[in-house]
Amino acid sequence: MPPYLYRLPTTSLITFSAILNDPSSSYTTILSDATASRTKLHLALKGIADNEPGASALAVLDAVQIYLPYLKGIIACLDADELLFKGEPTFQWRAPLTHFSFSSPLLPLASIHSEHLMVVLTYALALSNYAHSILASLPAFEIPAGPKAMPHMSSEDEKRTTAGLARAVDLLCQASGVAEWAAENVCLQVEPLKGVSSGRLGKGKWPAESSRETFKALSMILLADAHLTAIRKLLFPVLTYTLFAPPGPPLPPNHPSAPLQAKLYLYVHQLYSSARALLSVHQQPTSSAPSNSSRKLFRSNTDKDVIEPEAVEGEIIPELKRYLAKEAQLALALAHKWLGIDAGENGKGAKVGEALAWVKDAQGRLEDLEDSKMRAKLKGLSIGKSRERKKEERRARMGRVERELEVVKAWVKAYQKMNDTVAFQPVPPVSSLVTPSGRPIFGPKAFIPPPSKFSPSRIGHLNEEQGNDSPELGETEDTSYAGKGNYF
């Protein structure tokens, strides 16, 4: 169930006074504070990796909020030559989106800009994981598949669920905006470093996290997850009807528009598919590819084919590849379901054949996702996760497919009966039908970085010459900025 739960990066400890030279001795205290703030981030990430009590994505977000202004100040002072590296700098990080055959190593990444990139990546992933934790804490409100107990919700649960869904959507939009900003800003500063020997993965290859395409894809994935969460919120008011009424026609009067839902799911499918295409850019060069089979995920294929991801050293982790493949397929199936319902319910009896074509196609796609052979192939691909967690995720994904398949079968049965007894219309092939374009309901939330905690002293001197009140040497004023305090 979206959003995807990411493994967060981890890093080693750094003492800035040990790697930076401060010729003017103006930044001794500030560098000590920067080291303390980075240590807090290190401990927050380590706590999650070690499953320590109290560790959470919220603690990581708090640590990033404190450290990022210090990091920006250090970068500004390095650019102004007021701070200098004592030697060749390396910042060790574990890359959570890059697959490794064995345990993920600490990669020595060159340049302070690599450090900046990994911190911003941590911020985006932690925002998504925080949204995931909010949704996981909500009462169960979707109908379970099969003859199981129906969820029961009090009015207090309904308020809490509505607020939780809205908050999760906002967090995911923030995360999407952070990833988009990183792709257009920080990644461009890391690109020239790709020829540097340190930080490489294999033969001249950096981790997937260093790629601009990866951040663009990540922004799309997070935005798609936000839309799916928004759709859940959109359908929440009709929960009572869906709990007690059998699936199939007619829709209740207060049900969200069928064409709107179809266009939303088409947009989600477009985002996931575009993300898959962008992630293929970071795959191994042909000369170093282990085999042609490792490229199957991104080869051209029919929409109904779900190509299984393979675990290839240095490429995107197979769990994320599989997530994109399945969510793209599921979104397209649900889009076709709602296109069929729109044709059947709003066509005044003139489009029963078209409605039947759409819902039958949706049924076929959902059955492909439910195929037991395909699930057996996927079983061993969740590397790095506990067995129980893999079972829970598979069970949750399976429940969604089963639930939707039951609903679609009811619509197919209803439209088939209507066509056989009343309409007598031919059922056209889906390829002959016009698919509308997808429709977004929001975009990424623009990310404006917080101001630096301190700045080069010569900027302060310039302010004095211009007659402005300048802050204390090496520090900046605590000005307001868009999104201030809205880190989590």
From Swiss-Prot:
> Which InterPro entries does this chain map to?
BRO1_dom, BRO1_sf, pH-resp_palC
Any GO BP annotation: cellular response to pH
- Pfam families cross-referenced by the UniProt entry: BRO1
What SMART domains has UniProt attached to this entry? BRO1
Entry keyword rRNA-binding: no
Q: Which residues does the annotated region (Disordered) include?
A: 449-488
Q: Does the keyword rRNA processing apply?
A: no
Gene3D superfamilies in alphabetical order: alix/aip1 like domains (1.25.40.280)
Quote the cellular component terms of the Gene Ontology held in the record: plasma membrane
Domain called BRO1: residue spans:
2-430
Q: List the disulfide bonds.
A: none
UniProt keyword annotations, A-Z: Coiled coil
Q: Which family does it belong to?
A: Belongs to the palC family.
Q: What PANTHER family does the record tag this protein with? A: PH-RESPONSE REGULATOR PROTEIN PALC
Function description: Required for the proteolytic cleavage of the transcription factor RIM101 in response to alkaline ambient pH.
Protein name from the UniProt record: pH-response regulator protein palC
The record lists the organism as: Cryptococcus neoformans var. neoformans serotype D (strain B-3501A)
